[in-house]
């Protein structure tokens, strides 16, 4: 992993864009797997309930960072439209115990196939899920 030096600045800007401290929107920021790995370790995101990162070509590496993070216990909604997390990334998120409050997953346009859909359907960790968007994938 490359060292990502300005994640705290990006987090501050993400809060400004969303105008509250419960939503982080990085839709208009330059964001990469390295940035996601840094964000997942940042203590500045503990209160985040909604995380939006669209169109950034994030891969399973980002999904794994989120799934292994101890810094997002309050996350309820995750929108990762137009990325590339794929079946492997979905599996990380479906199996994690570290996102206990997740209610909404929005993964349209993410190169997810039948295996990823099966991981979500079989997950014992997503009992509180009330909304799932998988449109425009290869299911």
Locations of regions flagged by a protein language model:
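N-terminal segments that cap or nucleate solenoid repeat domains
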Residues: 1-51, 57
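Short, solvent-exposed loop/turn at the beta-strand->alpha-helix junction
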Residues: 4-8, 29-37, 56-64, 84-91, ...
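Compositionally biased, intrinsically disordered low-complexity segments
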Residues: 10, 48-51, 88, 93, ...
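C-terminal capping segment of individual leucine-rich repeats
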Residues: 17, 41-44, 68-71, 95-98, ...
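Structural register of leucine-rich repeats
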Residues: 22-24, 37, 46-49, 64, ...
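Concave beta-strand-loop units of leucine-rich repeat
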Residues: 24-31, 51-57, 72, 79-84, ...
